[in-house]
């Protein structure tokens, strides 16, 4: 499935609800560098308690799997490392949600996101500096060489315009 289709499945409900989010991971890499395959969308989110119910209601249909409210609430309370996903069953596409918690890099993603238009949908994408640092962290923590290829691609396409102070 083209990444624009993944965006069409998951981003419009977030925008309609006014959810504070930033796209990270493979979709962000594609936006800041060369096309590559991805089968999900990764999102850093800040969801106050009442917003959790709205998010789950937006994906409450037979076409989506969403975790129970209690699971999402528990993941949102974690100071770091929280995670839950919502899956579009017919296409097997998924959105991985990462609660911002206490991670300053996630805070930067939510504060300094950049708006991009993809497939007719406006999405908030974490700045390339955040993507570079996060990809390096994932590689350090045992990730694949794909993370390094993604970093190289971002540096090749947007390297001169990166905020080097933000990378420090």
Give, region by region, the residue ranges found by the protein language model.
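Compositionally biased terminal segments of proteins
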Residues: 1-168
């Amino acid at each position: 499935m083209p990444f624009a289709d993944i965006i069409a499945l998951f981003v419009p409900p977030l925008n309609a609800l006014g959810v504070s989010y930033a796209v990270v991971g493979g979709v962000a890499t594609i936006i800041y560098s060369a096309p590559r395959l991805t089968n999900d969308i990764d999102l850093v989110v800040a969801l106050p308690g009442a917003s959790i119910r709205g998010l789950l209601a937006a994906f409450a249909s037979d076409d989506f799997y969403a975790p129970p409210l209690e699971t999402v609430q528990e993941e949102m309370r974690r100071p770091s490392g929280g995670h839950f996903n919502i899956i579009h069953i017919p296409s097997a596409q998924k959105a991985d949600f990462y609660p911002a918690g206490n991670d300053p890099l996630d805070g930067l993603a939510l504060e300094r996101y950049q708006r991009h238009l993809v497939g007719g949908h406006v999405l908030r994408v974490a700045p390339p500096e955040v993507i570079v640092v996060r990809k390096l962290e994932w590689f350090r923590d045992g990730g694949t060489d794909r993370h390094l290829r993604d970093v190289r691609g971002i540096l090749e396409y947007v390297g001169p315009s990166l905020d080097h102070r933000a990378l420090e």
